[in-house]
């Protein structure tokens, strides 16, 4: 059960019912209070009815109708009846107040109309009198002009007679006649002057009356204008005061819609300008980071390629030396020596019969297909490595060519060492043939420095091999010499592998530095890309927000239109009730 208070919005119901002067605010508050009380009472009655129905259903599934005497109204029913009567009284009171306002407004309009008629009559009367006096005044002015003209004519005639009299003989009859005419004209002139004086006096009187009437007319016109302005101001003030709460809310809603629309548009423009500026800056930053990333990647790739070539070359050399060392520890050298001896004998027989060495012809493709490309590859690798270290291009090319030729020669020397301990004569013959080919290659590579070196290269290689064997102990015990050679070569392999590992590690570190810089630039580029994507998202959100605000504005306009339509319908209904 709701606790219903008899006071709503600070206006007791008893005071409202007994009040003889109720304003719009009071009536509106009373209507709201009555409607709220009515709703609460209906809710209580519905709840009680539901409780009774539930109890009846719980007692029996079938309800048998019973005839009972009508009950008197309980407290809730009496309150509902009271509220209904209150709503009816307040409605009649509101309608009565509106009728009284309309009646007062009609009376005010009638009084204003009557006053306007009075002003109109006075102004029309004064205007008619002024027009009459104006016509009389014009007539008197014409009379004055005629009188002045008549007096002037008489004066001219008198002057002519006086001139004639002065010329005549005093005793002549004509002079007497002219004297009598002069006297008559003088009498007429005096009469004309007297008439003019009367006309002038009357004209002045009419002029005075016309001036008074004109002033009265101007005064009435000013009074009428002041009254009209005051009435218009009062009517405008009354119209403004007569605006209801709904109309004021409608006006406020229209102002609010205008402000929201303007602010929404300006906000969207500012957001778009800001986002565009940020996108331009991010775009420039991304282009710069992209260029830096590409440069770092190119550096890393170039270093990897150079170090890879160096590693491959060193690895190949170490592999060859390892094979040579392994040959000294097993029986592979004997088979290789036998093959070498057979080749040398066969080559001698063929050369004696035909005059051509097939060994030289057989080694030619190897030099063309293997040794020369190897020397060129080594020369290019050393040249690029030196250029990377800052050496001049011409000097780097020359030094690289020499180092490449030396490296290729070392490969051939290792091949000669392979069979040197088994068959010195075969090795010498093999070295002689290889020496000729190497001599030709080195002569083409550095002609000024090695111009006469090819003819003596076979002896030089043979003597170098002999000195190498002697240095390593090849003149002593053959088995011990092989072991010593194998040991030294294995040590050289280990040292070379260490150098190769260090070189590759250094290259890897340098490459990692470039890759780290490239990764940093790539991270900055990715971050800038993400920021650009976020800016695009913010732009979409700003446009979506603008659309949502436009929908809110449309809803407000629809609400305002509906409110105005409802107000018009209520006004029509009230007008119909008033005129009924």
Curated annotation (Swiss-Prot):
According to the record, the residues making up region (Mediates interaction with human MAD2L2) are 61-70
Q: Does the keyword RNA-binding apply?
A: no
- Tell me where the transmembrane regions lie: 313-333, 399-419
Where is the segment annotated IpgC chaperone binding domain 2?
Answer: 51-72
Give the location in the cell: Secreted; Host membrane; Host cell; Host nucleus
Relate the induction remark in this record.
Synthesis of this immunogen is repressed at 30 degrees Celsius and restored at 37 degrees Celsius.
Q: How is its activity regulated?
A: Interaction with the membrane is affected by the pH. IpaB/SctE is more efficient in destabilizing the membrane at pH 5.0 than at neutral pH.
One GO cellular component this record assigns the protein to is: host cell membrane
Could you tell me the keywords of this UniProt record?
Coiled coil, Host membrane, Host nucleus, Membrane, Plasmid, Secreted, Transmembrane, Transmembrane helix, Virulence
What effect does gene inactivation have here? Deletion mutant shows fast constitutive secretion and displays increased adhesion to HeLa cells. Mutant is non-hemolytic in the presence of sheep red blood cell (RBC). Mutant displays normal secretons.
Q: Where is this region: IpgC chaperone binding domain 1?
A: 15-45
Q: Which Pfam families match?
A: SseC (PF04888), T3SSipB (PF16535)
Supply the InterPro entries for this chain: BipB-like_C, IpaB/BipB/SctE_N, T3SS_SctE/BipB
Coiled-coil boundaries: 104-224
Q: Does the keyword Methyltransferase apply?
A: no
Top-rank lineage group of the source organism: Bacteria
Q: What is known of its domains?
A: The immediate N-terminus is needed for recognition by the secretion apparatus and chaperone binding. The N-terminal region is necessary for interaction with IpaD/SctA and the sequential maturation of the T3SS needle tip. The C-terminal half is key to the activities needed for formation of an active translocon and possibly for translocation itself. The extreme C-terminus is required for efficient needle tip binding, and its absence also affects regulation of secretion and adhesion to and possibly invasion of host cells.
The record describes its quaternary structure and partners as: The core secretion machinery of the T3SS is composed of approximately 20 different proteins, including cytoplasmic components, a base, an export apparatus and a needle. This subunit is involved in the formation of a pore, called the translocon, in host membrane. Interacts with IpaC/SctB. Interacts with the needle tip protein IpaD/SctA. Interacts with the molecular chaperone IpgC, which prevents premature association with IpaC/SctB within the cytoplasm of Shigella cells and protects IpaB/SctE from proteolysis. Interacts with the host protein ICE in the cytoplasm of infected macrophages.
| UniProt similarity note | Belongs to the SctE/SipB/YopB family.
Q: What does this protein do?
A: Component of the type III secretion system (T3SS), also called injectisome, which is used to inject bacterial effector proteins into eukaryotic host cells. IpaB/SctE and IpaC/SctB are inserted into the host membrane where they form a pore and allow the translocation of effector proteins into the cytosol of target cells. Interaction with IpaD/SctA at needle tips leads to the formation of the MxiH/SctF-IpaD/SctA-IpaB/SctE ternary complex, which is essential for host cell sensing. Required for efficient dissemination. Necessary for lysis of the two cellular membranes that surround bacteria in protrusions during cell-to-cell spread. Is sufficient to induce macrophage apoptosis through activation of the interleukin-1 beta converting enzyme (ICE) in infected macrophages. In epithelial cells, causes cell-cycle arrest by targeting host MAD2L2, an anaphase-promoting complex/cyclosome (APC) inhibitor.
Question: Can you say what this protein is called?
Answer: Type 3 secretion system translocon protein SctE
| Organism encoding this protein | Shigella flexneri
Gene label = sctE
